[in-house]
Each structure stands twice: as C-alpha cells, then as structure tokens.
C-alpha cells in the first residue's frame, strides 16, 4: 500500500479536532482523558500532535474522535 504524503502534514483532521475541542472548552489533556474513559488509548501528546498535523491518525482514532464529538467521521475532514 502506498501512502501519499507531502512530507509536511501527516493528517487533514487536526484543525477540525482542535476547533471541536475548543468549542467544548476542553484542554488537550481533558480530551485525552475523555477518550480514555471511552476505552481508547490517547494521551495529551497524541492530541497535540494530531492538532499540529505532525502525526498520522488511524481509522480507530478517527472513530474515537467522531464518537466523542458526536459527528460523522466525514465531518472531521476539510
């Protein structure tokens, strides 16, 4: 499988994750804790790197984020 990557950003969803987190008035740490309570493995650094687009995001992580924010996965994309 070939991964298409421009060498700069590693995901497209980071800005939307940050926007949704701020709307819910959560810190990165608080968001990570909420996702952990749902049974997903996230930490503050994971959230930071996703938001900064310096980390690839797995399909399971996309599911976790969309579940927590109560949105369709497609809504995470620009």
Regions inferred by a protein language model and the residue ranges of each:
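A short, Lys/Arg-rich alpha-helix, primarily the initiator
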Residues: 1-24
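Residue-level signal for the short linker/turn that defines the boundary of a DNA-recognition helix
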Residues: 15, 26, 42, 57-60
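Alpha-helical residues within the helix-turn-helix
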Residues: 22, 33, 67
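Short alpha-helical DNA-recognition segment
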Residues: 25-49
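DNA major-groove recognition helix of helix-turn-helix/homeodomain DNA-binding modules
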Residues: 54, 58-75
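Phosphate-coordinating loops and pocket residues in cytosolic domains that bind phosphorylated ligands
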Residues: 78
């Amino acid at each position: 499988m070939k991964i298409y990557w421009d060498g700069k950003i590693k995901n497209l969803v980071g800005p939307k994750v940050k926007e949704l987190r701020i709307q819910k008035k959560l810190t990165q740490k608080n968001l990570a804790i909420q996702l952990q309570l749902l049974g997903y493995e996230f930490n503050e650094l994971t959230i930071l790197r996703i938001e900064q687009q310096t980390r690839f995001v797995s399909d399971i992580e996309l599911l976790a984020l969309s579940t927590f924010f109560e949105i369709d996965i497609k809504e995470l994309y620009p």
